[in-house]
Amino acid sequence: MDAYSLAQSGAGARTATRADFIRRTYLHLAGAILAFLALEYYLLNTPAITNPLVKLAFGSRYGWLGLIGGFAVGGWLARSFAANVKSTGAQYFGLALYVVLEALIFVPLIVLAVQYDKSGTTLKAAGIMTTMLFAGLTGIALTSKRNFSFMRSYLMMGGFVALGLIVLSIMIGFTLGIVFSGAMIVLACGAILYDTSRIMHEFDTSQH
C-alpha cells in the first residue's frame, strides 16, 4: 500500500470515528432531554419541592438572583466534570448534575407561565419553537462544516452583558422588555452554533 492509500485509509478511519462520536453525543443529548422532562414532571407534581422553589424565586427581589447565581456556579461545576477526558464517570456526573439544575430552575418559570396562560398554549408554542430552532441551527452547523469557534469571545461578552443587565433590573426594578428577550434568543442561537461546531471540530472522541 502506497503513502497516498495509507493517508486515505487513515482519513477514512478518522471520519468514521468522528461520525460515531457525533452519533453517541446526540444519543446522550436525547437521553438527557428525556431525563429532564421526566424530572420536571416529577418536580412540578411534588408541592414539597415546587412551592419552596417558587417562593424563593418570587418571594423577594433577590430570590431569583440567588437562583441564577446558584445555577451559574452549579453549571460551571457540571461543565468541569463533563469536560474531564480521563473519567467517563465524571462526564456522566456532570451531565446528570446539569440536567438536575436545569429541571430545578425551570420549575418557577413553568409555574409562572401556567399562571399567565392556564391553557398551556404558550408553553406548547415555546416548546415547538425551541425544538425547531435547535434542530435547524444544529443542522446548519453540521452540514456547513464551518468552524464557529470564533464566536466564543462574542458569546462570553454577550453573556456577561446580559447577566449584568439582569442583576441591574432586579436591584433597580426596571423591566428589560422585548428587545432584551430578542437579544437573548440571538445569543442562544449563537451558543447552539458554537457548541455544535466544537462537537464537530474540537472535542475529543471520548467526550460524548
Short names for language-model regions:
Residues 1-208:
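A hydrophobic alpha-helical transmembrane-helix feature that marks the membrane cores
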